[in-house]
Amino acid sequence: MKRIVHFTILILLLNLCFLFSPRPKPETNFCGEYIPINAYAGFIRNCDANEFLESAISPSALVRENYVRQSRPLYVIAASGIGYVIYYTSNLFTSEDLIGVEKSMYVAYVCLNFIILLFALILFEKIILILTKGEIPYVVILLLSVFIASNFMSKAFFWTAHQQMLAFLMPLLSIYISIHVIKGKSDMWLYVLFFLMGVGMLMYGSFLILFGVFILQRCYAYYEERKITLQSVVFLAISCLIFFMPTVLWIWFLKYIGIEYYSHEVVRYHQLVWMTEALSISAGTFVSAMYVNVIEFFKTIDKLYLFIGLLTITMFVRKIKTGIVFEWNRNSKLILLNLVCFGCFFIVLGYYANRLTFTLMPILLCLSVANSGQMLRNKKNQVALLITVSIWHAVNVLSYGPFS
C-alpha cells in the first residue's frame, strides 16, 4: 500500500507540472484545444476527446453506423460507468447540477489515465524486482519510473479523454506475464487467459500483440520439449478461437441488430490490411509498400534514442567488466521476444507516429535493467541516473509541445 501511495504521488506531481508547460501559440495548428485553468496553467483537450465523451455519455452511440469508437467499446463503457458514478455522487445532496455529465465523463477518462499509469508502474516495479532478484534500491525503481510517468505522451494525453496511456501498460503487462505468470500453467488456465485477452481486444488493439507473444512462447516451449504433436496443434487452434471469440461475438451482435461492423483503424488508416491490399495487386507492390513503411517507421523512433543509448551503455560496461555484451538468460530472452513482437507489429501496422513507436520504451527500459547487473547498485551510477531523470523531466515540462 505504501508503494501505491508513492507511485500515486509520483504520477500526480510529474503530470501536474505539465499544466504549467508552454501553451500553444495562436499560429500553431494541432488536433485539439487548449483549456486554460488560470493565467499560468492549462491543458490540452485532444480532438479525439469529442467522440470519447459522446460515446461515454451515451454508449448507444457505439451501435451507430460507421461510428469511430465502435471497434473498441469496452474502454468507453468503463469510462461511462466511472463517469456516471462521479456525476450522481457529485449531485447526491443537492438539486443543482454541480459538475454536469460531460465534465463528469472527462474526469472519468482522466481517472482512467491515472489508474492505467498506476498499474503500469506497479507492474514495472514487479518486473524490476524479478530481473534484479530484489537486489535493487527502492529509490532506483522510483527514478526509473519517472521515464514512464513523465514523457511527451503523458504530457499530451494524461489530461485529456483518450486511451493512449494503455501504450505504457500493454508492454509491461506482456513482459510480466511472460516472465512470471505463464510458466508452468495448465492449458485450461491459458484458455482463460487468452479469453480475457480477447475481451481486452475490445478495449485496445495491442492485446493482439500480447496474444502473439504468448503463442510464440508456447510454441518455443513445445519445440524445446520436443512436444510438437497433434495435441499441441489442437491447443494452438483452440487458443486462437478463444482469443478471437469476443470480437466475433461483438461483430455478430452488431449484425444481429442490423449494423455493419466498423473499424476506423482499418477503414481510415488501412492498418494491417494494407498488406493484403498490396499483395492483391502484385508482389512488387507489396515489397515497395513494405520498403516505404519500414522507412516511415524508423522516422518515428527519435523519442527512443535515450533508451537505446541506455541499453548500449549497459552492453558496453558489461563487455568491459565481464567480457560478455549481453546477459542471455530466460528473462532477457523473453523481454527480447516482446521487443521483437511489438517492434514487428508497429513496423507492419501501416500507420506511423511517435506515440505508437514509443510503446517500445518500457521494453527497452526493462531490457536495460536486465542487462545492468550490479550497475544500478553503484552510488555514482545512481547519482548519474538522478541527474538524467531530472533533466529528462525538466525538458519535457519546459519544451514546446507536443499538443496532440
Predicted regions and their residues:
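Transmembrane-helix signature of polytopic, membrane-embedded enzymes
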Residues: 90-104, 119-150
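Hydrophobic, aromatic-rich transmembrane alpha-helices
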Residues: 121-122, 219-225, 295-329, 339-343, ...
